[in-house]
Amino acid sequence: MNAAPPPEQPLKPANRRRTTLLLRMGLLMGGALAATLAATWIYFHPSAQRQRGVCYGSRDGVSLCLDIATPKEANGLGIVFIVSGGWKSSHDRGHEWLTAPFLRRGYTVFSVFHLSQPRATVAEIFGDVSRAIRFIGNRAEEYGVDPDRLGVIGGSAGGHLSLLLATQGGPEPAADGTSIKSRVRAAVVFCPVTDLTDLTGSTEDPGDGGPPRNFRAAFDQRPVDIDRWRETARELSPLHHVTSDLPPTLIFHGDRDTLVPISQSERFRDAAVTAGCDVELVVIRGAGHTWLTMPLQVIQAARWFDAQL
């Protein structure tokens, strides 16, 4: 016959106090974490009037659209966010959290989408985002922004397109019914491609001076024509269009980025400084092509635009 289990011993007073303290600490920490998460969610979901799917043009029968977010207390200034990664663009790229710091500072945000490669070449994509800038400028009064004080922001391919706007934007032919310039007043970019003629250090470098190995169709390089590529690469490289007219530019780049090496940003900065331009490069130590603290740099970018626009 099995013996009855011994009765449970009550906790000693010291152990009881320790257990109670640990429980209270756990509850406090859990409450603090919940409060932090709630505050973070609220911060990145500010109240704003949103217009989605505003058509600014078309390509190959496909409508080209942008979204507009207007804060309750708009400051009359606009930020254009080029939504692009790998020169592909869609609403499912999780971009809206990036707009929050700008909306909270009173900026009207225009999120520009383009037809993705390979359906459109990078040259065509640049033409389309330029068209979006002119579209916004032509309707600036309707949107409550100053057409001469637009900022642009983008990362990776979006950063490349943003720098093309900063270096090559200007008065355009009125083929689309507008004569508004497509140049911006200031630019913030993350890990941008700046020089397609020299991809040294990139995992996309084919080693023969040709186009990025996984983006040949995007540059209309199938089959590869090296002579034609050199011309295209130079035309689509912001580095080769730096002049003293370059608007103030802020660059964030991880020093361990292997897709777009930091040398791309360093060489752009050096060329801009030589031309007498205001370009700042912020190096994110130990970071690759993306990093966890990027939201903090977006907040920093919003403050930087305050001083530039």
Regions found by a protein language model. Give the residues of each.
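Short beta-strand/loop motif that positions the catalytic acidic residue
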Residues: D245, I251-H253, D257
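Mobile cap/lid helix-loop segments that gate and shape the active-site cleft of serine hydrolases
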Residues: R59, D198-H241
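N-terminal cap/lid segment of alpha/beta-hydrolase-fold proteins
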Residues: L37-E73
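Catalytic active-site module of serine/aspartate enzymes centered on a nucleophile-bearing elbow/loop
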Residues: P295-L309
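Catalytic nucleophile-loop/oxyanion-hole region of alpha/beta-hydrolase
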Residues: C55-Y56, S90-D92, L98, F110-P147, ...
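Short beta-strand element of the alpha/beta-hydrolase
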Residues: N75-G86
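Primarily recognizes the serine-hydrolase "nucleophile elbow" in alpha/beta-hydrolase
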Residues: R134-E204
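Conserved alpha/beta-hydrolase "acid-adjacent" motif
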Residues: T258-R267
